[in-house]
Swiss-Prot record:
UniProt-annotated binding residues for S-adenosyl-L-methionine: G49, W51, D69, D87, D111
Protein name per Swiss-Prot or TrEMBL: Ribosomal RNA large subunit methyltransferase E
Functional description taken from the UniProt entry: Specifically methylates the uridine in position 2552 of 23S rRNA at the 2'-O position of the ribose in the fully assembled 50S ribosomal subunit.
Top-level division of the source organism's lineage: Bacteria
Localization in the cell: Cytoplasm
Reaction it catalyzes: uridine(2552) in 23S rRNA + S-adenosyl-L-methionine = 2'-O-methyluridine(2552) in 23S rRNA + S-adenosyl-L-homocysteine + H(+)
Catalytic residues as annotated in Swiss-Prot or TrEMBL: K151
A Pfam family this chain is assigned to: FtsJ
One cellular component term from this protein's GO annotations in UniProt: cytoplasm
Similarity comment: Belongs to the class I-like SAM-binding methyltransferase superfamily. RNA methyltransferase RlmE family.
Enzyme Commission number: 2.1.1.166
GO molecular function, one term: rRNA (uridine-2'-O-)-methyltransferase activity
Length: 201
């Protein structure tokens, strides 16, 4: 198991990414073709910045990435990435202005995860709260036909999230990348074809 984990950790360091999570996003994009040149992407829970870097590469210099996280990061981003230190549960006026100025977005991605307590039920409940808030942000700024990717710690209460996703998107897929740790409870919902009517629910 340790060798398996170290493979992605070392690969990330060799390729100048701040975290191994970059390979999860690459697997998701290779499978579902989320990104195209010139797209605008919103990255929630972006620190330390691997997903933002990966998205920036795939949308190219004419694309834009707005990244935010409760924590700051010292990652050096390319010119097409804007990073803001923000709490998605208490969004500042400056962040709302950035959403309005840079949006609407073609893709919203969320790798947000709670600080784990070691108590499975608590961690799953907090993960679900983050997913629901990420979806609320997506409802606010995702274009019709757009895509949404969100990380969830699987548990008994995910049905309410799945129901909300299926009401908003044409296609909802469950995907666990090979680069996820085998013992991890995380998985990703990959949602395609936003209907554009989430705010009316």
């Amino acid at each position: 198991m340790k060798t398996y984990r170290d493979h992605y950790f070392l690969k990330a360091k060799q390729e100048n990414y701040p975290a191994r999570s970059i390979y999860k996003l690459k697997e998701i994009d290779n499978r579902f073709k989320l990104f195209r040149q010139g797209m605008k992407v919103l990255d929630l829970g972006a620190a330390p910045g691997s997903w933002s870097l990966g998205a920036a590469e795939r949308v190219g210099p004419k694309g834009r990435v707005l990244a935010c996280d409760l924590q700051t990061t010292d990652t050096q981003f390319p010119p097409n990435v804007t990073f803001m230190q923000e709490d998605v549960f208490n969004r500042s006026e400056a962040f709302e202005d950035a959403l309005a100025a840079m949006g609407p977005f073609h893709v919203v991605i969320s790798d947000m995860a709670p600080r784990t307590t070691g108590t499975r039920f608590t961690d799953q409940a907090r993960s679900l709260e983050l997913c629901i808030e990420a979806l609320a942000v997506a409802d606010h700024c995702l274009i019709k036909g757009g895509s949404f990717v969100v990380k969830i710690f699987m548990g008994p209460d995910v049905k309410q999230l799945l129901d909300a996703l299926r009401a908003r998107f044409e296609t909802v897929k469950t995907f666990k990348p090979k680069s996820s740790r085998v013992e991890s409870k995380e998985t990703f919902y990959v949602c395609l074809g936003y209907r554009g009517d989430g705010q009316q629910d």
